């Protein structure tokens, strides 16, 4: 059920939960629709990822989903298509406090992202709070002085180069957590479409341990319940355990198959695939 707006609109409860080591269970949103987002908001997840990298989301569709989630006790996380300074500025002005930025391969990239998410003098974020939903259009009097501290920056490491630089990336001040992307990582390691390959699995486990050892929050997406629980046991603190598109597709196929004859069902088996997506 919808909840009253939190007393402190600037407090990033998701960031504070990660800092406290409290596991946060999430769901990926790829349907790019506020109605679906609101359904998922009431399901009981700690966070929902609005995906702008692989789903057909833009700034306006992201805004609509943020508005749909606002009345619920769930933390929105937004993944932009790329770590572009200008796009990040727009998302932050919409009220996004937690960003998951894909394809971060070097500590230099990570430092640039920290700069993009902070107001001067700590960063280079442009100031336009009178136009920003984030400040409630200047109705939050201390927004400009507190905004930097409440931003949660999560960077996504998903390549061989990223793994090589993982320790340096995790050490960047202002990076709150590092997310391992199994699908792209498997491709980079030479196992396209096979994130469960032993080489990939070993690389993921090693990466999660290194992130935790660096004192940063470790995250991952796995629709395999056994694997998701395994990653939590390894110390991952923000774990997405499903994708809305997959949930809908599987439920629709299962329902249709239950009314079809056996030969049709055998001729059209449930797609398995190797990707967590």
From Swiss-Prot:
Residues flagged as site, Increases basicity of active site His: 93
Domain of life: Bacteria
Enzyme Commission number, as recorded: 4.1.2.-
Cofactor names: a divalent metal cation
Alphabetized InterPro entries for the sequence: Aldolase/citrate-lyase_domain, HpaI, HpcH-HpaI_aldolase, Pyrv/PenolPyrv_kinase-like_dom, Pyrv_kinase-like_dom_sf
One term of GO molecular function: aldehyde-lyase activity
GO CC, any one term: cytoplasm
Gene3D superfamilies recorded: Phosphoenolpyruvate-binding domains
Keyword Transcription regulation recorded: no
EC top class named in words: lyase
Keywords, ordered alphabetically: Lyase, Metal-binding, Pyruvate
Catalytic site positions: 54 (proton acceptor)
Family that this chain belongs to: Belongs to the HpcH/HpaI aldolase family.
Purpose of the protein: Aldolase which can catalyze in vitro the aldolisation reaction between hydroxypyruvate (HPA) or pyruvate (PA) and D-glyceraldehyde (D-GA). The condensation of hydroxypyruvate and D-glyceraldehyde produces (3R,4S,5R)-3,4,5,6-tetrahydroxy-2-oxohexanoate as the major product, 2-dehydro-D-gluconate and 2-dehydro-D-galactonate. The condensation of pyruvate and D-glyceraldehyde produces 2-dehydro-3-deoxy-L-galactonate as the major product.
Protein name: Hydroxypyruvate/pyruvate aldolase
């Amino acid at each position: 059920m919808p909840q009253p707006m939190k007393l402190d609109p600037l407090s990033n409860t998701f960031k504070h939960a990660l800092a406290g080591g409290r596991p946060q269970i999430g769901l990926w949103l790829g349907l790019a629709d506020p109605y679906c987002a609101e359904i998922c908001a009431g399901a009981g997840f700690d966070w929902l990822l609005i995906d702008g990298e692989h789903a057909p989301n833009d700034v306006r569709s992201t805004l609509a989903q943020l508005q749909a989630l606002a009345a619920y006790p769930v933390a929105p996380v937004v993944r932009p298509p790329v770590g572009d300074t200008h796009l990040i500025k727009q998302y932050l002005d919409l009220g996004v406090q937690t960003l998951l930025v894909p394809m971060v391969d070097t500590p230099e990239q990570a430092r640039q992202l920290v700069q993009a998410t902070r107001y001067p003098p700590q960063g280079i974020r442009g100031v336009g709070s009178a136009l920003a939903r984030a400040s409630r259009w200047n109705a939050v009097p201390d927004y400009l002085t507190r905004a930097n501290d409440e931003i949660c920056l999560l960077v996504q490491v998903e390549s061989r180069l990223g793994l090589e630089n993982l320790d340096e990336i995790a050490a960047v001040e202002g990076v709150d957590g590092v997310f391992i992307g199994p699908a792209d990582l498997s491709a980079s390691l030479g196992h396209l479409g096979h994130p469960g390959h032993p080489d990939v699995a070993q690389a993921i486990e090693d990466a999660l341990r290194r992130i935790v050892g660096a004192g940063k929050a470790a995250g991952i997406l796995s629709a395999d319940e056994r694997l998701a629980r395994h990653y939590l046991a390894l110390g991952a603190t923000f774990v997405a355990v499903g994708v809305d598109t997959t949930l809908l597709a599987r439920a629709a196929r299962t329902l249709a198959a239950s009314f079809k004859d056996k030969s049709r069902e055998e001729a059209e088996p449930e797609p398995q695939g190797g990707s967590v997506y």
